[in-house]
Amino acid sequence: EKYYYNNVIGTVNLLRAMLAHGVKKIVFSSTCATYGEPQYTPIDEQHPQNPINPYGRTKLMIEQIFADYERAYGLQHIALRYFNAAGCSADGKIGESHTPETHLIPLVLKAISGERKDIKVFGTDYDTPDGTCIRDYIHVEDLALAHRLAVEKLGSYNGCINLGTGIGTSVKEIITAAEEVSGKKCPT
């Protein structure tokens, strides 16, 4: 329910307020979750969308609402479809902070540092080279830059842009990289 209320109803309320004040431009943080299970990789913007959870469905609904508002009210919009945001800025001012933590990289680092007992690897039978799930990670500073560039493009482009690297990294590869950087073994 929270995704429907926050994402869909919240966006409609925001759009109503924007139109009431003559604002017709928006950059939206969408998600690769609008695609659901990939039919092919790398995933491009024309990939069929079939979200498999409420989060992805509500983000897709918002993209569809933007298209309707473009036709009805001239809304200029860019939806940035994030893949997996990761990392932080060198000064630590921009980055991930989740309570409770659910993202792989921070969980691995917490296990290595001893802040948590271990890291559980769920799924070792994927059709991937090492059997673990593969994700496309994008650094938070790259996301920030993409937002700035999208704001500059508003008016000359309406639509969606994927934000990823196009390079997948497996769960085991993340664990190995963290071990190499830290010089410590990750308890699994």
Q: Where does each model-flagged region fall?
A:
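A conserved catalytic-core signature of glycosyltransferases
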Residues: 29, 38, 133
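Hydrophobic pocket-lining residues that define ligand/cofactor binding sites across diverse proteins
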Residues: 18, 70, 150-154
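Glycine-centered small-residue hotspots that permit tight backbone geometry or close packing
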Residues: 29, 56, 95, 123, ...
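C-terminal substrate-binding subdomain of Rossmann-fold SDR/epimerase-dehydratase oxidoreductases
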Residues: 107-188
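Active-site proximal helix/loop that lines the substrate pocket
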Residues: 31-34, 87-90, 126, 152, ...
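Structural signature of the Rossmann-like NAD(P)-dependent dehydrogenase/reductase core
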Residues: 26-28, 34, 78-81, 120, ...
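Catalytic helix-loop patch of NAD(P)-dependent Rossmann-fold dehydrogenases
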Residues: 2-13, 20, 24-25, 34-79, ...
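Ser/Thr-centric signal marking residues that sit
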Residues: 11, 31, 58, 132, ...
